[in-house]
Amino acid sequence: MKSILTALGLLIASSACAAPQLIAHRGGTGDAPENTLPAIKLALENKAEAIWITVQLSHDGVPVLYRPSDLSVLTDHTGKVSSFSAAELARMDAGWKWGGETHPWRGKNATIPTLQSVLEQWPQTFFYIDIKSPDADPAMMASRLSEVLQTTHSLSRVRVYSTEDRYIAALPESIPHFVSRGETRTKLANISLSHQCQPTTQPGDDYWYGLELKRKVEIVEKFTLGEGVSPATLTWDKEAMDCFRSQGKAHIVFFGINSADDFRTASELGADGVMVDSPAKAKTW
């Protein structure tokens, strides 16, 4: 009887500390050129459980995978993504700058894929889609994104994020998405700095939040004769987790988890997911 109770206790403890979902940041940017088909393939081989990808709109309105505001950052071309068609982008080498001076991915078919091609190639994989288009109209992005997700029957296996609240606000209700970064950051700031648990402004009872485990910010204080600015760090801890989870069903994903220590902290806090640059390293934690 004692051994049965001991085993049951271990099972309960194990369930309570279940490991968070391992999410490959930009397809696993630490192991291969970000947001490319080879990177996604490698990340899944390295046991990533979901893929985080970055999306912009091409000149012909096609959602494609690319993050920086200029093509010169990662490819052998210059200009904005929105200046080229999806077909033209598909011929560009997105592995051109990866790997320092050795450039091991040049000429290895690490091109700029369309979102539709990615979803069709991995029909069973969960994707987090990060909208980064610097010049796309939010309504247009929402419309084109919706078309692709419906065409590929992917609405049940995606969730959309953006650092710009306007892109989240423009999404139709049919597209699963995160609570805006602005609201998430403000809510965490109130807990971290003032120990106040701010009610959510979002309707419903199921919420997804995403933010860095530790986020450096500047606090602006206004005085009679001017303003004072002081640095501060927003940190997730038990108080923060309890607050977020006291208001409906909260799912929390931590960004920038790139060490065993941070992964352990995220696991102990009960994070639902962690975003890592290198699934190859993360699978050893």
Task: Identify the residue ranges that each predicted region occupies.
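N-terminal signal peptide c-region/cleavage motif recognized by signal peptidases
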Residues: 13-15
